[in-house]
Amino acid sequence: MTIHHDLSPTLNLIRLANGEGLDLPAYESKGAAGMDLRAAVDEAAPLTLLPGKRALVPTGFIFEIPEGFEGQVRPRSGLAFKNGITCLNSPGTVDSDYRGEVKVLLANLGEEAFVISRGMRIAQMVIAPVTQMRVAEITEASETMRGAGGFGSTGV
């Protein structure tokens, strides 16, 4: 018999006025890596994203991401495939010391206008560990089998 203990860190959220009535960000399945983020746009004024345009879409929440972690904002595959809606600067990083509203930078790469309505799942956030490294300047790089070979250097 396996006994599971929940030792997961807690993600504290502050609901802003524009987030009233929205579901909390949530994992939609037991194996989901990312929690869905919803649009906190005005119900009476949905946002229309024209082809080739971008918009910063509010989520209605401030995230208190635990120290040692980051939030990675990523596109939802269904929106990208079906409508050409994606996140720019993907993944977008939400640092653990950021205390403003989380917003999602969406772009319409499709051929038709796309309407973003209140509560629509617009992106996902993956919480991931962060390592901060010491930085040291050196005069020569160590040798490796690959060397300075870049794009395509290991084969197609």
Curated annotation (Swiss-Prot):
Pathway: Pyrimidine metabolism; dUMP biosynthesis; dUMP from dCTP (dUTP route): step 2/2
Keywords: Hydrolase, Magnesium, Metal-binding, Nucleotide metabolism
Gene3D superfamilies: 2.70.40.10
Biological process terms in GO annotation: dUMP biosynthetic process; dUTP catabolic process
Binding site for substrate: 76-78, 89, 93-95, 103
GO MF annotations, alphabetized: dUTP diphosphatase activity; magnesium ion binding
EC number: 3.6.1.23
UniProt keyword Magnesium, yes or no: yes
Annotated gene: dut
Enzyme class: hydrolase
Catalysed reactions, semicolon-separated: dUTP + H2O = dUMP + diphosphate + H(+)
InterPro entries: dUTPase, dUTPase-like, dUTPase-like_sf, dUTPase_trimeric
Cofactor(s) it depends on: Mg(2+)
Function: This enzyme is involved in nucleotide metabolism: it produces dUMP, the immediate precursor of thymidine nucleotides and it decreases the intracellular concentration of dUTP so that uracil cannot be incorporated into DNA.
Protein name as catalogued: Deoxyuridine 5'-triphosphate nucleotidohydrolase
Assigned protein family: Belongs to the dUTPase family.
Origin species: Rhizobium johnstonii (strain DSM 114642 / LMG 32736 / 3841)
Domain of life: Bacteria
